[in-house]
Curated annotation (Swiss-Prot):
Belongs to the EF-Ts family. Residues 76-79 are annotated as: Involved in Mg(2+) ion dislocation from EF-Tu. The gene is tsf. It is found in: Cytoplasm. This is Elongation factor Ts. It comes from Corynebacterium efficiens (strain DSM 44549 / YS-314 / AJ 12310 / JCM 11189 / NBRC 100395). One of its GO terms (molecular function) is translation elongation factor activity.
Length: 275
């Protein structure tokens, strides 16, 4: 005869989030000792987390709180769109914002109800039976930060998130900054200004442009000018302020920001599963 009741199983499930069969086995193994059963399930959960660590977590969501944005990965979109997972990520984002987390290491260490975010993640991972990962975090400085979150479909959480720190007051400046955030989400700008492009990247692009131009058989005296033109094309594709605006292709992003009295000082873009 079992030395536990259905109420014990129910209570254990509610406390640990484990399945009914696992709860029954734990109570049997502990001879009905409830606290021991909890310990057994926690140990089992930790072992299962270790097994899940070998699997890839490429789904998930982007969450924002204040000036902070985080990415939390799961293995499947089934978990990603689960309300419990979304609420968990929102809680981590709030803690990350309070700590101004700005790296994966800082994100993992933030305090969540008296334990680290990483420990909270492992417990939640054991509960839902799927590998989870605290991928990254960024916090932008400034009083004004525009946010844009993009959903691949209505039933999924945000898979792309953008933060844009800006200066400027009023609704026009706010709208222009949000439009810039949407631009970054769509066209994946890598740099704010051309001065932000690393010298090694410029040299690589210049070398590629020169090689292509020579292979096209252009006159030697024309090569430098053609190379500079192609380098300018690189800037127009990859530098936010030099991109043609998706809102008005006849104007650059900078021109529209200037018209609204807004100046972008920094931005960050996260896409689930991407670098």
């Amino acid at each position: 005869m079992a030395n536990y009741t259905a109420a014990d199983v129910k209570k254990l499930r509610e406390l640990t989030g484990s399945g009914m069969l696992d709860c029954k086995k734990a109570l049997e193994e502990s001879a009905g000792d409830f606290d021991k059963a909890v310990e057994i399930l926690r140990i089992k959960g930790a072992k299962d987390v270790g097994k899940r660590a070998e699997r890839n977590a490429t789904e998930g969501l982007v969450a924002v709180s204040g000036n902070t944005m985080i990415e939390v990965n799961s293995e499947t979109d089934f978990v990603a769109k689960n309300d419990e997972f979304k609420n968990f990520a929102a809680k981590i984002a709030e803690a990350a914002a309070a700590a101004k987390a700005n790296s994966p290491e800082e994100l993992a260490a933030v305090d969540v109800d008296g334990q680290s975010a990483q420990d909270a993640l492992q417990e939640f991972s054991a509960k839902i039976g799927e590998k989870l990962e605290l991928r990254r975090a960024v916090t932008l400085e400034g009083d004004n930060v525009a946010v844009y979150l993009h959903h691949r479909s209505a039933d999924l959480p945000p898979s792309v998130g953008v933060l844009v720190a800006y200066t400027g007051e009023g609704e026009e400046a706010e709208a222009a900054a949000r439009q810039a955030a949407m631009q970054i989400a769509a066209l994946r700008a890598s740099y704010l200004t051309r001065e932000d492009v690393p010298a090694e990247v410029i040299e690589k692009e210049r070398s590629i442009a020169e090689q292509i131009t020579r292979e096209e058989g252009k006159p030697e005296q024309a090569i430098p000018k053609i190379v500079e033109g192609r380098l300018n094309g690189f800037y127009k594709e990859n530098v936010l302020l030099e991109q043609a605006s998706v809102a008005d292709s006849k104007k650059t992003v900078k021109a529209l920001l200037d018209e609204a009295g807004a100046t972008v000082t920094a931005f960050a873009r996260f896409e689930v599963g991407q670098a």
